[in-house]
Structure formats: structure tokens, C-alpha cells
Amino acid sequence: GTLNFLNGVPQFAISIGYEEKGEIISGIIFDPIKDEMFFAEKGGGAFLNNSRIRVSNKNKLKDSYLVTGGPKADSKKREGIFEEYTKISNIVDAPIRKFGSAALDIANVACGRFDGYWQWELKYWDIAAGIIILKEAGGFIEFIESNEKNSLKKNIIATNSKIHQELMGSLLKKNIE
């Protein structure tokens, strides 16, 4: 959401994740435009403005509403990402959305607005808070290992857990590796 913020696009958030001994134990994502605050603490559930949230119940990829992020200009995966987008677009009934804020995209999966999200080459600090919020809302997040050693970039799939394997199986193998 940094580029959105810098360019006046109202889709960005303040996102803070707290990690202790290698585990994220709390997180908060604040959307100042909509005045929405997502937060979670390990074992305490996930909330949106003090109301408990849960992921959606959709269990088929075809019926799912998905969101993704786009490739950076210097991404080695750029060509494959567009191919992947097209492949998944041909599976799902609803159009795939792209808003440009990883933190909000994960938060929106956590509260059931979307059923799944995937993106490659994210910075950890952009998704740390979303990890605990999604898990506490009943979702699943998977980190896909990069071939780049010691990379700060993260490849993730975040879902309601019911469509996770189907989405993972639909992504292009060359982008996962």
C-alpha cells in the first residue's frame, strides 16, 4: 500500500505485527480511510472494530472471490505472474481483484470479504500482522520457499483454508519455485 499512499490512492493501511521468539503473537492493521481496525492476539481470536471475524465458508475455488498482488517492475516472475492470473481467472466465476495493499488483502480474507489471496515477493513487514489475524480468524497462510537465499521477499498463499489446496494446485509451478 506504500505506492497507493504516495499517489493518493485510498487503499493503504498501517500494519504492525509483534513477533516474539520467531512467532508472531499479535497484530493490528488499521485502514484510516474506512476507519477499520483489524486485530488479533494468539489464542484470542480476530476482530474488526471489536466484532469477532471469521473467514468465509466457500469450499470450491470456482465459487471463490480472490484477490492478488501484482509483480514489481524488476520481478523475474513478471511474465509467469500474468500467465498464472489468466489461468486462475479461467477457473473462478468472479473476477480476481488487485488493490495493492497486502496487509488489507489478507485482512479482507480474514473477515470473509475474500476467500483467498496470493502474491509473490512480498516484504515480511507488509504481511506480519495479517498472518496472526488470518490464523485467528480460522484461515491458513502458507509461505512458499524462494530459491533466493536469505531473501526478505516472501511468497504467500492466504486462504479460508477450505480452498487452499485447490488454489495451490492451480498456481504455476515455475512461480512457486
Describe each model-derived feature in a short phrase.
Residues 1-47:
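DPxDG-like acidic metal-binding loop motif
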Residues 19-23, 33, 42-45, 51, ...:
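Short loop segments at secondary-structure junctions
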Residues 39, 46-49, 68, 116:
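Short hydrophobic/aromatic-rich beta-strand segments that constitute the beta-sheet cores
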Residues 54-177:
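An extended, acidic
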